[in-house]
């Protein structure tokens, strides 16, 4: 059946298609060849082309640092720089990519509501709002640490959830995550892919995210848009995620398509998200609108995408108040993720909280953080050498690689699945009488050689 897509007519969001089409022109606020640097693009999200050159002199780097980083990074233009470049800790935040995965759990109550409701379209409203909610945290411009192979992150004491993530592959960097409470199970395999463009970088979310709602066994599949990080070296760094997010109910065929508007002149369209919940016949049933850094609302609509008479917009999600003037723009939940308040009893020694480089950066000691980061990277190379000399192969503890290779808009993905061993481990740990202070545990993700010293 052909899609009755209101974007093609005069519906409530008739301008969406042209906004996406004009993405290229909206992003033309740039200066190419600035100061003799060929291919340099600087974009001021709050201005126009007239002040792009002025914008180039802003940002976190001094002029000599900008020049040095530009010369160093030029050779990588067009490349995937996910793990091939050693970067200074000054651009890092005290968090790893595994912890970043856990930030998706902040508003997990929306998945609880999706499981509880009997309305199939409200189910999609709640679930897609959960998927949107993390973008407020994702706008941070600091780089998280790449996890060490075998590194983990555990989280408890939040909405009844047990969360576990593990770095399952080093080249290419791949992470797997699982979270569960009485209402839902979340499973994710992530293999980020990047393209360095000089003063910006495209981040492609190669991955598979599935949520199972336990009451009816409904399975939801999520495909997010790419993310673009602007002004990496010249100008103030900022993040945009233009494009569409699609969440599909694999059980019923219902779906949500939400459009992230690209940032236009003087910030127009920035943060805006609009779209519809469709039934399996691709007929719009609910319109959704809002800003991913503020709130989302919904309203029942007709077949043309227009609001039904007698209905009104209702807010479904609102961003929680964040700390003022936080150095890393952390939310209260991000601080909670970094703390031991969310750590379970008998925390795994491979947990991200225990990384000495991450902790040193959190304490404000960049020199020590840089030293510890280099030390961990050296030990990781030593373990790899030891493993290869012995003819041994790394195997994740809490996830198993399957034979499934799933296509994504940005490339194929090898799928890892939760093997259930962590649930057994956690039950045993919770029944243990061990009262060891987890903060005193030494970080040790190594499997093949005692490299913790």
UniProtKB/Swiss-Prot annotation:
Annotated keywords: Endoplasmic reticulum, Fertilization, Golgi apparatus, Lipid transport, Lipid-binding, Steroid-binding, Transport
GO biological process, one term: double fertilization forming a zygote and endosperm
Region (Required for binding to PVA12 and location in the ER): 398-403
Protein name (Swiss-Prot/TrEMBL): Oxysterol-binding protein-related protein 3A
Role this protein plays: Oxysterol-binding protein that may be involved in the transport of sterols between the ER and the Golgi. Binds beta-sitosterol. Required for ovule fertilization.
Gene encoding the protein: ORP3A
Organism name: Arabidopsis thaliana (Mouse-ear cress)
Assembly description: Interacts with PVA12.
Basic and acidic residues compositional bias, start-end: 370-392
Known tissue expression: Expressed in roots, leaves, stems, flowers and pollen.
Similarity comment text for this entry: Belongs to the OSBP family.
Region (Required for oxysterol binding): 166-175
């Amino acid at each position: 059946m052909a899609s009755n897509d209101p974007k093609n007519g005069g519906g409530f969001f008739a301008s969406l298609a042209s906004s996406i089409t004009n993405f290229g022109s909206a992003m033309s606020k740039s200066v190419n060849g600035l100061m003799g640097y060929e291919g340099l693009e600087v974009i001021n999200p709050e201005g126009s082309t007239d002040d792009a050159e002025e914008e180039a002199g802003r940002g976190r780097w001094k002029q000599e640092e900008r020049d040095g980083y530009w010369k160093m990074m030029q050779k990588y233009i067009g490349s995937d720089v996910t793990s091939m470049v050693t970067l200074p800790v000054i651009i890092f935040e005290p968090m790893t990519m595994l912890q970043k995965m856990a930030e998706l759990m902040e508003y997990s109550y929306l998945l609880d509501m999706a499981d509880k409701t009997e309305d199939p379209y409200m189910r999609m409203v709640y679930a897609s709002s959960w998927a949107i909610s993390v973008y407020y945290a994702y706008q941070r411009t600091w780089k998280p640490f790449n996890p060490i192979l075998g590194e983990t992150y555990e989280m408890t004491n939040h909405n009844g959830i047990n969360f576990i993530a593990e770095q399952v592959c080093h080249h290419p960097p791949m992470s797997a995550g699982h979270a569960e409470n009485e209402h839902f199970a979340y499973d994710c395999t992530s293999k980020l892919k990047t393209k360095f463009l000089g003063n910006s970088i495209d981040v492609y979310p190669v991955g598979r995210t599935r949520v199972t709602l336990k009451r009816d066994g409904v399975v939801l599949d999520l495909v997010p848009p790419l993310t673009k990080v602007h002004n990496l070296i010249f100008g103030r760094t900022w993040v945009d995620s233009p494009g569409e997010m699609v969440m599909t109910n694999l059980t019923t065929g219902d779906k949500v398509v939400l459009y992230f508007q690209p940032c236009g002149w003087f910030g127009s369209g920035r943060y805006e998200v609009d779209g519809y919940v469709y039934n399996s016949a691709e007929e719009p049933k609910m319109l959704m609108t809002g800003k991913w850094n503020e709130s989302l609302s919904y309203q029942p609509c007709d077949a043309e995408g227009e609001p039904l008479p007698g209905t009104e917009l209702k807010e479904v999600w609102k961003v929680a108040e964040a700390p003022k003037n936080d150095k890393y723009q952390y939310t209260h939940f991000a601080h909670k993720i970094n703390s031991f308040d969310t750590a379970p009893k008998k925390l795994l020694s491979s947990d991200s909280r225990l990384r000495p480089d991450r902790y040193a950066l959190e304490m404000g000691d960049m020199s020590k953080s840089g030293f510890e980061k280099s030390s961990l990277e050296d030990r990781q190379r030593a373990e790899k050498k030891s493993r290869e000399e012995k003819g041994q192969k790394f195997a994740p503890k809490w996830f198993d690689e399957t034979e499934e290779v799933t296509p994504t808009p940005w490339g194929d993905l090898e799928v890892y699945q939760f093997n259930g061993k962590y649930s057994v481990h956690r039950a045993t740990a919770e029944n243990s009488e061990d009262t060891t202070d987890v903060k005193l545990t030494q970080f040790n993700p190594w499997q093949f050689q005692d490299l913790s010293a």
